[in-house]
């Protein structure tokens, strides 16, 4: 705030502080509250920077228990740990049948959304739940290939999109339009996986 006093700030805990620069910092101090309460090290702190068009440009996904900080920006993504910082990239998986996919909790989806997810679950090789924003970090790190979620708030998503894209992944809504922070979001390691997933997801797109 001292270095960028004209920027807006939006957070889950703070609401919106207006700015005049056209830039908005979007903050979520603890994403994955249930994991935090349970003592599971998959909760994260999220910091996103959104431009005046509503596009997420820079993102940070920080997991202090594991000492992992994922940083995404136009043209690159990095993982910072105690041993230093190094570039990261998505996996080379191009087939949903070979993919590791994730969502936080399918039971918070609408019934049509659950139907779309069920088709993805039946097709993918491995399915994981309950990772919240950390699942998107692991797309960037190359161990998860697709995440699909719905009902996201801006503070849930603004940090995630730049990290995935910076690592070479893709992010869009369930119609296949370029992702904006919030709502329905699908991120994938490759165009092949994304195209296969959208066949199902478009049926329940908002």
Where are these regions (language model features)?
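N-terminal subdomain of lithium-sensitive/metallo-dependent phosphomonoesterases centered on the IMPase/IPPase/PAP
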Residues: 1-30, 170, 192-199, 206
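Conserved residues at the C-terminal ends of beta-strands
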Residues: 12, 62, 150
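Short hydrophobic/aromatic-rich beta-strand segments that constitute the beta-sheet cores
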Residues: 59, 77-82, 103, 146
């Amino acid at each position: 705030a001292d270095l960028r006093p004209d920027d807006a700030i939006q957070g889950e805990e703070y609401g919106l502080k207006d700015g005049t620069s056209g830039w908005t910092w979007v903050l979520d101090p603890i994403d994955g509250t249930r994991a935090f309460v349970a003592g599971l090290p998959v909760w994260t702190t999220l910091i996103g920077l959104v431009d005046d068009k509503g596009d997420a440009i820079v993102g940070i996904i920080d997991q202090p228990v594991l000492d992992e900080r994922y940083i995404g920006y136009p043209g690159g993504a990095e993982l910072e740990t105690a041993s230093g910082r190094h570039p990261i990239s998505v996996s080379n998986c191009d087939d949903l049948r070979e993919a590791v996919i994730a969502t936080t909790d399918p039971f918070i989806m609408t019934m049509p959304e659950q139907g779309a997810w069920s088709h993805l679950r039946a097709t993918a090789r491995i399915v994981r739940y309950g990772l919240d924003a950390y699942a998107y970090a692991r797309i960037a790190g190359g161990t998860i290939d697709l995440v699909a979620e719905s009902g996201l708030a801006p503070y849930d998503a603004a940090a995630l999109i730049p990290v995935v894209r910076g690592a070479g992944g893709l992010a869009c809504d369930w119609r296949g339009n370029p992702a904006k922070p919030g709502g329905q979001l699908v991120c994938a390691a490759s165009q092949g996986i994304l195209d296969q997933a959208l066949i199902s997801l478009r049926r329940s797109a908002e």
